[in-house]
From Swiss-Prot:
<feature type="domain" description="MPN">
    <location>
        <begin position="30"/>
        <end position="166"/>
    </location>
</feature>
<keyword id="KW-0963">Cytoplasm</keyword>
<feature type="compositionally biased region" description="Low complexity">
    <location>
        <begin position="312"/>
        <end position="321"/>
    </location>
</feature>
<dbReference type="Pfam" id="PF13012">
    <property type="entry name" value="MitMem_reg"/>
</dbReference>
<feature type="compositionally biased region" description="Gly residues">
    <location>
        <begin position="322"/>
        <end position="331"/>
    </location>
</feature>
<dbReference type="GO" id="GO:0008237">
    <property type="term" value="F:metallopeptidase activity"/>
</dbReference>
<feature type="compositionally biased region" description="Basic and acidic residues">
    <location>
        <begin position="335"/>
        <end position="345"/>
    </location>
</feature>
<dbReference type="GO" id="GO:0031369">
    <property type="term" value="F:translation initiation factor binding"/>
</dbReference>
<comment type="function">
    <text>Component of the eukaryotic translation initiation factor 3 (eIF-3) complex, which is involved in protein synthesis of a specialized repertoire of mRNAs and, together with other initiation factors, stimulates binding of mRNA and methionyl-tRNAi to the 40S ribosome. The eIF-3 complex specifically targets and initiates translation of a subset of mRNAs involved in cell proliferation.</text>
</comment>
<comment type="subunit">
    <text>Component of the eukaryotic translation initiation factor 3 (eIF-3) complex.</text>
</comment>
<dbReference type="InterPro" id="IPR037518">
    <property type="entry name" value="MPN"/>
</dbReference>
<feature type="region of interest" description="Disordered">
    <location>
        <begin position="310"/>
        <end position="345"/>
    </location>
</feature>
<dbReference type="GO" id="GO:0003743">
    <property type="term" value="F:translation initiation factor activity"/>
</dbReference>
<dbReference type="InterPro" id="IPR000555">
    <property type="entry name" value="JAMM/MPN+_dom"/>
</dbReference>
<dbReference type="InterPro" id="IPR027531">
    <property type="entry name" value="eIF3f"/>
</dbReference>
<protein>
    <recommendedName>
        <fullName>Eukaryotic translation initiation factor 3 subunit F</fullName>
    </recommendedName>
</protein>
<dbReference type="GO" id="GO:0033290">
    <property type="term" value="C:eukaryotic 48S preinitiation complex"/>
</dbReference>
């Protein structure tokens, strides 16, 4: 991912719009969830060969004061674009938006995305649609997220809001001034672990990777930490030996990192770490035991049902046999009675 740039926001006059209908163009911060980026990349991979870019809708949440927007999910919107015109399936966009908002009531429409860093006249038209009244984000600004998907290059992301410009209202409807806003890709520890697992398959010929167990993941994390410590140690030694230029910012960062280290003895750290490992092993053992017990209970219940069915069938057969025997004895008795009557006659 490209590094986040710094932005200076300047207030500018809006275009000629009706009184009381001007959208908000206050500076804001955009937070992007990794699953939204993956959805955009997946849409880009599935595009037609003759399409230079694809577009879609951004969904997420907005803070109460409107200064922070969090992009959580996306969905693709079909469009055709030529050098002269652009056509967007707005009806499909409205129906999909209604379905998503029904499934996720806490999310709202926050903007749209495009898989190209280029901003042109068509971008202004689409931006004005998403930021308009009714089906748009008005009175809040619509966020335009650009994600470059050129093969062989790093993924570069940019976030914009817009302000209408133009001498007349008609010109303002076809134009927009895109204002870059700061953004960040925010993820938790679980998402970071998943991203690292996916990234480990980029150098494999099969483009596949294995899922590590908790112990293996812990071992890899410790190895990475040891590697970073060795790299920092070599850098500090090279600075002391005047083999590398010193960096005040990096030195301050290392000093702050060392200040976070707990003031305890190494023996205490090792003891606590070993206790933690034992706790992890106990929890893993108990989880496996519970899983085994559940599987065994299911198998025993299935076996009892099978045996019960066979016993019921055998008992029913025996009862039918007994009824058949009684019927045979009754028939034999009736035959003997008829023979006696014939003899008396």
């Amino acid at each position: 991912m490209a590094e986040t740039d710094s932005f200076l926001h300047l207030a500018r006059p809006l275009g000629p719009v009706a009184v009381g209908s001007a959208p908000t163009t206050a500076p804001l911060n955009v937070v992007i969830q990794p699953q939204a980026i993956f959805s955009i990349l997946d849409h880009s991979l599935r595009r037609n060969a003759d399409q230079e870019r694809v577009i879609g809708t951004l969904l997420g949440t907005r803070s109460e004061d409107g200064t922070e927007v969090e992009i959580r999910s996306t969905f693709a919107v079909g469009h055709t674009e030529t050098t002269d015109q652009v056509e967007v399936d707005m009806e499909y966009q409205k129906q999909m938006l209604a379905l998503h908002l029904k499934a996720n009531p806490k999310e709202v429409l926050v903007g749209w995305y495009a898989t190209s860093s280029e901003l042109n006249t068509f971008s202004a038209l689409i931006q004005n649609f998403y930021s308009g009244q009714g089906d748009g984000t008005w009175p809040h600004p619509a966020v335009h997220l650009t994600v470059s998907t050129e093969p062989g290059k790093d993924i570069e992301t940019r976030a914009y809001i817009s302000a209408p410009v133009g001498v007349t209202a008609e010109r303002a409807a076809d134009s927009a001034a895109f204002i870059p806003v700061p953004y960040e890709i925010r993820y938790g520890e679980a998402e970071k672990s998943g991203l690292e697992t996916i990234a480990s398959a980029k150098d494999a010929e099969s483009r596949a990777t294995n899922i590590f167990t908790d112990i293996e993941a812990l071992e890899r994390a410790i190895e990475e930490v040891l590697g970073m410590i060795d790299r920092v140690s070599r850098y500090v030694e090279s600075v002391i030996d005047e083999e590398a230029p010193a960096s005040t910012a990096l030195g301050q960062f290392l000093l702050n990192a060392l200040a976070l280290a707990p003031k305890v003895e190494p023996a205490d750290i090792e003891r606590d770490f070993n206790n933690h490992i034992q706790d992890v092993l106990v929890v893993s053992y108990l989880a496996n035991t519970i899983r085994t017990q559940m599987e065994l209970s299911n198998r025993l219940a299935t076996a009892q049902l099978t045996l019960g069915g066979e016993g019921a069938s055998a008992e029913a057969g025996a009862q039918r046999g007994q009824r058949g025997g009684r019927g045979g004895r009754g028939g034999q008795q009736r035959t003997q009675e008829r023979a006696s009557e014939e003899v008396r006659a």
